[in-house]
Amino acid sequence: MTRTVMCRKYQEELPGLERPPYPGAKGQDIFDHVSAKAWADWQKHQTLLINEKRLNMMNADDRKYLQGEMDKFFSGEEYAKADGYVPPAE
């Protein structure tokens, strides 16, 4: 049976992640409140940010920036977008 969560991003009951994506309290919070769909959407957006803004994941400031953007993304706040990116038409 698929585990569901009340997704913080989409504000609806959706299938959850299979396991916490991070260790510790942050990973448990994501596991409990973020759907698999929202997590997959974040991973795509995160990749755009890393590439377009040339973030270095070995740099603590870049990791902190990305963590902040992830929090904004899931909470519904305004979050950074890749400059000039136009999503494909569906």
From Swiss-Prot:
Coiled coil: none annotated. GO terms for molecular function: iron ion binding. InterPro entries: Fe_traffick_prot_YggX, Fe_traffick_prot_YggX_sf. Gene3D superfamilies: Fe(II) trafficking protein YggX. Keywords: Iron. GO terms for biological process: cellular response to oxidative stress. SUPFAM superfamilies: YggX-like. One of its GO terms (cellular component) is cytosol. Could be a mediator in iron transactions between iron acquisition and iron-requiring processes, such as synthesis and/or repair of Fe-S clusters in biosynthetic enzymes. Belongs to the Fe(2+)-trafficking protein family. This is Probable Fe(2+)-trafficking protein. It comes from Pseudomonas fluorescens (strain ATCC BAA-477 / NRRL B-23932 / Pf-5).
